[in-house]
């Protein structure tokens, strides 16, 4: 499928949910998976920022089995009145020299082009859209109606932190996230192949999306098989925030997991060891999050 009408047509027939929502219960670990502790070689050798391989020990913890959904984030906003970064007035003192359209609240949105001149210029498919936010992830005229079980997007780091604090939880550190993505297996292979059980880009990025996995964009949570300890969508679908600062990019945090925009011809970060920086105050529509909490062995 190329950009434009064909992509929109396919999107209309996608599933709206794959897993039932987490039941309302007093169990503090409802909807979470226990990740046993262990020691492993963290990192990878594919891209420079993934090196060096280093031995890391992680204590056991609980982690959300899926990325936080629109429904879950909506419950947080309803309970607290929270306003996300993408909905607030833009602080032009922090970001001087912005063009006028970027001085309005909004988020960065993937817009599938019909053609591109190489893949070096990401502005060919990424656009800052005034009015885009978690309620309107594609901008004005879009909504999350009938998308309650899709992962919430257009979430800045501060927003993810606020939700986690409200739940009495935290964002995972990079080592915790990577260990969980490896299914707590120190011998998990560092595969370079495009994963079959993950929402990634099939075709020529960014102009042809064959959508062989049934999704031309983001999938509802839990549509693909979980990993060996029961965590869904750790690879693909959305990048995920971690609590760790990115060492060579001031004001940025480490994000992990790749997204539905990763393809063999572009990105190649659908691997547990992959990482990249993300500006903490930038809301985008290929990035979400999940939470963790310390606890005892179940």
Protein language model regions, located:
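N-terminal pre-domain segments of enzymes
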Residues: 2-26
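Functional-site microenvironments in short loops/helix caps that host divalent-cation chemistry
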Residues: 8-14, 34-35, 41, 89-276, ...
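Short, conserved catalytic-motif segment at the N-terminal edge
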Residues: 40-59, 140-143
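Short Gly/aromatic-enriched secondary-structure transition segments
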Residues: 47, 52-54, 74-79, 89-90
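Short capping motifs at secondary-structure boundaries
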Residues: 61, 76-85, 167-168
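An anion-binding catalytic pocket shared by soluble metabolic enzymes
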Residues: 64
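Acidic glycine-/aspartate-rich tracts in secreted/extracellular proteins
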Residues: 68, 244-247, 296-297
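Short, structured beta-strand segments at or near domain termini in extracellular proteins/domains
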Residues: 285-298
């Amino acid at each position: 499928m190329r950009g434009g009408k064909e992509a929109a047509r396919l999107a209309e027939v996608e599933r709206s949910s794959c897993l039932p929502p987490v039941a309302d219960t007093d169990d503090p670990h409802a909807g979470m998976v226990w990740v046993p502790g262990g020691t492993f070689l963290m990192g990878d050798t594919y891209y420079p920022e993934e090196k060096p391989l280093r031995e890391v020990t992680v204590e056991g913890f609980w982690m959300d089995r899926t990325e936080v959904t629109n429904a879950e984030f909506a419950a947080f906003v309803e309970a607290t009145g929270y306003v996300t970064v993408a909905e607030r007035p833009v602080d032009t003192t922090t970001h001087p020299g912005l063009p006028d359209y970027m001085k309005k609240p909004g988020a960065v949105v993937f817009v599938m082009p019909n053609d591109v001149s190489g893949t070096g210029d990401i502005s060919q498919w990424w656009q800052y859209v005034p009015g885009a936010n978690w309620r309107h992830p594609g901008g004005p005229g879009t909504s999350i109606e009938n998308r309650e079980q899709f992962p919430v997007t257009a979430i800045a780091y501060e927003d993810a932190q606020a939700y986690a604090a409200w739940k009495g939880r935290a964002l995972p550190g990079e080592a915790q996230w990577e260990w969980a993505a490896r299914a707590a297996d120190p011998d998990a292979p560092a595969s370079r192949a495009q994963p079959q059980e993950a929402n990634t880009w099939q075709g020529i990025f960014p102009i042809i999306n064959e959508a062989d996995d049934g999704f031309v964009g983001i999938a509802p949570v839990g549509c693909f098989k979980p990993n060996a300890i029961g965590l869904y969508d750790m690879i693909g679908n959305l990048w995920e925030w971690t609590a760790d600062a990115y060492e060579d990019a001031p004001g940025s945090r480490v994000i992990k997991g790749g997204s539905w925009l990763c393809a063999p011809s572009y990105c190649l970060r659908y691997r547990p060891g992959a990482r990249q920086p993300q500006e903490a105050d930038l809301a985008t529509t290929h990035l979400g999050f999940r939470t963790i909490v310390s606890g005892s062995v179940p």
